[in-house]
Amino acid sequence: MAELQLTVVITTKNEAANIAACIHSFDVVREQGKVEVIVVDNASTDETKKIAAELGAAVFDKGPERSAQRNLGWQKGRAPWAMIIDADMIIPPETVEEILEKTAARGETAAYWIPEVRTGTGFRVKARNFERSFYNGTCIDALRLFRKDVLEKTGGYDENLIAGPEDWELDIRVLALGVKCEVLEHHLIHNERQLTLKRVLEKKAYYSHSMAEYQAKWPNHSAVKKQFSFYYRYLGVFIEKGKWRKILRHPILFVGVMCERVLVGFVYLKNRKK
């Protein structure tokens, strides 16, 4: 049996439609003993926990939100590295292989951002994937793969932030340690086939509720200023470090990105006034 390298933490709430595919991403490496899967559920009323348990995952219950779920997951983990993902994510074999190569290397890097590609067809999906490609390794992105000692030093996710900015907030504290963070070469797949524009805006509205608390916690931090800067979110992140060349190659996709960004911005401002 190989040495245990990685704890995969999956947070769930009524994810019966997605959890099996997510767990199956790690079948081969779990059999080899390199990876363990921990599912932390928040009061699901469907078959999520049953499916996860039948597939051999360790299943725990925790609420009220995903920060607490994630913290319980990595704390229960036995491996020196932890990866935090959602149930609607699938990790391709080449990405799993790269992750295990990185976690076995014992190098200086202590955490990784993982590029995301959304499933589906049509212009909106292409535009969203185009938008996401600009965020890799920026303050708009969020670390997902951590050396466990880094999580222990930071204390993990801030459980006072209900949902939305807890990823960004943890990144601030990880980077403050002075550790090296990198972007993986390979991506994960985010299964959002059923995610309509209406649902996207509803999710953004929900996530916006903790944003004021996050800003109050880090009022003068440069990353937070960028995250809430009109210039950076609508232009800066798309043109920095030579990324403007991508816009010239795909101008129509960029127009699609901007249209959705305007709607998201409107929803955020509307909820800030409540």
Where are these regions (language model features)?
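Non-catalytic, C-terminal membrane-associated alpha-helical segments of glycosyltransferases
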Residues: 198, 203-210, 216-274
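Acidic donor-binding loop at a coil-to-helix junction in glycosyltransferase catalytic cores
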Residues: 156, 163-172, 187
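Short, well-formed alpha-helical segments that are part of the catalytic scaffolds
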Residues: 14-29
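A recurrent flexible, glycine/aromatic-enriched loop bordering the glycosyltransferase active site
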Residues: 117-118, 129-146, 162-163, 188
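A conserved acidic beta->alpha catalytic loop
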Residues: 25, 41-49, 89-90
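Conserved donor NDP-sugar-binding/catalytic core segment of glycosyltransferases
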Residues: 90-123
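Glycine-rich, basic loop-to-helix element that forms the pyrophosphate-binding segment
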Residues: 61-77
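Short aromatic/hydrophobic "clamp" motif used to bind/position activated sugar donors
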Residues: 82
